[in-house]
Amino acid sequence: VRMAQYGLNRELVSIYARMARDRRYRGLFCVVSDPVDPLCRAVLRESGLSPAQVRGFGLGVMHARALYYARRDPRFASYLTEGRAFGPHGEDLVLANSVAHYDDALSRELTDKVAHANLEMRKLGYKPYVAPALSSGALSLLLCLRGQWHCSSTYLGGVFMGARNRVTAAGTELERLPLPRQLQDRLQTTMDRLRAID
């Protein structure tokens, strides 16, 4: 569904990206439409803005959903204090149950539950739009504007990739953590998939 939205949303975001270029816009250009990460790259290409000016907001809801499952299932409880969310929201999401005591199988199970939680809500007859609007949109945007740690997509290695970061006077500060090899491999796979999207 998200990639089906890409063509139309890319056209729309390109209009605003060109307006930003024409007006020599110097603020943040924040993308909240799906698919967030590829649209950020489209904005960067069309706008002439610096990569630090473009930011995507889609990962916050994935982090919030992971917290929900971590509170409900003791197997995922380590996510509450040591867990992290990376990448886009959707199929290429990467969750780590813990960065200190990473369990690949548990992390993949949590990732699968979170990535498909919206489908479970739809089965119950609800369209999940409030949680993303708050977690990825309003709350994450406010944290970003205040210079506080939050989940958003920033430019990294030629793609926009979601991770915990904050805006400082010097630019974007990404959270730096020692990551286990299995987690690094998952992140590389996600980056490669994002890079393949035109």
Predicted regions and their residues:
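Long, compositionally biased stretches enriched for glycine and/or charged residues
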Residues: R72-D198
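Rossmann-like NAD(P)-binding element
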Residues: V1-G27
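Alpha-helical scaffold segments in soluble metabolic enzymes
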Residues: I15, M19, A42, Y69, ...
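Rossmann-fold dinucleotide-binding core
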Residues: V31-H101
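Short C-terminal domain-edge/linker segments immediately following a structured domain
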Residues: A20-R21, G60-H63, V114-H116, A196-I197
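Short alpha-helical basic/polar micro-motif
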Residues: L28, D34, S136
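Short amphipathic alpha-helical segments, especially helix-boundary/capping motifs
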Residues: I15-A20, R41-R45, T111-N118
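Conserved active-site and cofactor/substrate-binding residues in soluble primary-metabolism enzymes
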Residues: G7-E11, I15, P38, A133-S140, ...
